[in-house]
Structure formats: structure tokens, C-alpha cells
């Protein structure tokens, strides 16, 4: 069963791919819809912001009204050389004295030089140029036509903007009564629905949905296991979130989706479905333990990617405020 519908410009995000994922739980025969079935974006052929278009002054004010006592939760992980990293990535910080002591007050300065990948390190925000389906980025932009040594000329992470939205925590690990889901557990639509019911929350248009798997407990404790695989959402859960018109999907693992994917013929299909097809942003490696401990399930979620011109993503330090 292969399902797809054409994305009509100006239509709702749901109309873009309401039936792109088959109803079978395994999705063994699922294929990404071809360019003519997924483009142009519902936000227009020239759109570079994807689901960020769902954020409005009204939605920002609604998110601000969720703040009751002003307690802040830092959702970003510490950045240093001990963190888990994908092959080929590294993090080195070199401290240096840059000036001084100067003047009668003996003023001096210190700076650091950091050698790392700014876009995909630590707690990270995936922009719309991070992944591609064949030759195409989001909105069927041909990667080769916009890729330069100094970055992408379209769909750079600087186009995403800043986010101040309603955030929802769906604690799947707690739902299952475990500290951490199994390595290869694929989160399903019934899991999301049960977590919503347990938390007594609904998912609304423009939300940031944060999914706790417990996998973050391995961070700097067992980096090899953390990187090898992970529990996460599958395609049908991703479709469920798109149907609710979410803006951001985040998790405490490194790819949001289950890895490796059960269908060995698919590689990072949730990335493709959310980023490339629907323009929904991902935030990976979140620290969700304090939110889970305090049972905070609805909050204001704030994240701002670096203005890295032409970048594919950004290290970020999101916060939740209740």
C-alpha cells in the first residue's frame, strides 16, 4: 500500500500528507511520496520556514499564559568532550588569555577557541537543510543548486527564526513503568494517545511535542550504547503528530526516531517525513528528566537556533517555563 496526496499551496499541513503513511503498523511497503505529490509546500513554492509558519503573535501570547510560577527548566545538555558523538564529529575547547593585565585596574581578558560542528552537536536543532530525499531538500529545493562551500543559499537554519510555543511532554517511559525504554522500542500512535490521556493533555496546532524515552540517562554514562541505537517514534507516530499540526518534535535521544528502523530498507524515514516532507523541526538530545520528575506536562517552550547563515542546524539550549 503506497499512499500520497498532492500538497496544494495554501492548504493545511495535514492536507499535505494526510495519507502518506500506510495504516499497517509495520509500514513495510511504505515509500516517501515523489516530489510532484509533496510539493509545493502548503506555505508556498518559495517557503523556507516550514512549520515555523504556524507560530503567530496569538500563539506566542497563548504560550506565555501557560507560565504560572516562573519556574524554568534547562533542557539542554552540557557541551564538552565527554559527550556521545556520531562518528566523524568532535568537540575541543581551548582556553586562552587574550589580553592584560592592562591599566591601573589590571584588566585582562580570556577567550576560548572551539573546534566542533556547530549544527549537529549536543542538544541540537535540525533545520530544513539537514536532510534530503534523493537530490531534494524541503519544498523540493534541489540541494546541488543551493549548496555552497560556505553554506546553503536557501533553507539555512537562520531562516527558522525563534520559537516561543506551547510545549507538551509525553513521557512514554513513565507510561510503560520503566526508567528507560528498550533499545529498539518503536513508539506507536496508541503510546502517544495513552500518554496524552495519562497526562490529561491534548496536542494543539503549533505545539512543540517533547517525547521522553529515558534514553538520555545514558548520556556520558554509556556513550557507545547511546549512539548504537535508540527507542523512538515510528512513521505512524510521526504522521499522528503531523495531523495535529505540530511545529517541533523533540526527544531525549539522538534522532527522535527509533534506530535502527525496523524496516531495514528505510534509513531515517521519520527525519525525511518530518523535515523534508512536512517542514517540522526536530530537537534532539533534550534533558527531560527534571520535567518528568516534577510531572510538568504543559509549559512555555523557548528555543532559538544560532543565526548560522546557510547552516543545517544549531546546537541549542532550550528552556521550559511553567
Language model: regions and residue ranges:
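Bacterial N-terminal signal peptides
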Residues: 10-20
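Long, low-complexity intrinsically disordered regions enriched in Ser/Thr/Asp/Glu with frequent Gly/Pro
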Residues: 22-24
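Active-/binding-site microenvironments in catalytic and ligand-binding cores
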Residues: 26-322
Amino acid at each position: 500500500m503506497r499512499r500520497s496526496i498532492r500538497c496544494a499551496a495554501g492548504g493545511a499541513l495535514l492536507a499535505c500528507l494526510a495519507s502518506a503513511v500506510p495504516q499497517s503498523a509495520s509500514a513495510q511497503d511504505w515509500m516517501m511520496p515523489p516530489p510532484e505529490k509533496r510539493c509545493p509546500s502548503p506555505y508556498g513554492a518559495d517557503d523556507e520556514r516550514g512549520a515555523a509558519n504556524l507560530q503567530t503573535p496569538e500563539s506566542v501570547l497563548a504560550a506565555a499564559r501557560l507560565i504560572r510560577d516562573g519556574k524554568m527548566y534547562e533542557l539542554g545538555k552540557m557541551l564538552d568532550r565527554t559527550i556521545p558523538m556520531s562518528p566523524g564529529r568532535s568537540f575541543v575547547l581551548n582556553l586562552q588569555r587574550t589580553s592584560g593585565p592592562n591599566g591601573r585596574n589590571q584588566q585582562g581578558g580570556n577567550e576560548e577557541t572551539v573546534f566542533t560542528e556547530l549544527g549537529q552537536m549536543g542538544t541540537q536543532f535540525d533545520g530544513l537543510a539537514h536532510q534530503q530525499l534523493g537530490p531534494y531538500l524541503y519544498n523540493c529545493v534541489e540541494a546541488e543548486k543551493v549548496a555552497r562551500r560556505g553554506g546553503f543559499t536557501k533553507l539555512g537554519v537562520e531562516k527558522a527564526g525563534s520559537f516561543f510555543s506551547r510545549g507538551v511532554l509525553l513521557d512514554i517511559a513513565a507510561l510503560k513503568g520503566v526508567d528507560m525504554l528498550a533499545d529498539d522500542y518503536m513508539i506507536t500512535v496508541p503510546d502517544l494517545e495513552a500518554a496524552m490521556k495519562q497526562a490529561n493533555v491534548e496536542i494543539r496546532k503549533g505545539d512543540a511535542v517533547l517525547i521522553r524515552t529515558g534514553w538520555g540517562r545514558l548520556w556520558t554514562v554509556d556513550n557507545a550504547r547511546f549512539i548504537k541505537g535508540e527507542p523512538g517514534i515510528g512513521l505512524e507516530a510521526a504522521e499522528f503528530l503531523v495531523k495535529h499540526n505540530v511545529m517541533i518534535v523533540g526527544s531525549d535521544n539522538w534522532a527522535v526516531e527509533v534506530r535502527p528502523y525496523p524496516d531495514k530498507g528505510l534509513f531515517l524515514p521519520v527525519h525525511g517525513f518530518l523535515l523534508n516532507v512536512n517542514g517540522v523541526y526536530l530537537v534532539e538530545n533534550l534533558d527531560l528528566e527534571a520535567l518528568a520528575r516534577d510531572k510538568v506536562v504543559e509549559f512555555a517552550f523557548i528555543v532559538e537556533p544560532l543565526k548560522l547563515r546557510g547552516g543545517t542546524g544549531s546546537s541549542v539550549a532550550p528552556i521550559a517555563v511553567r
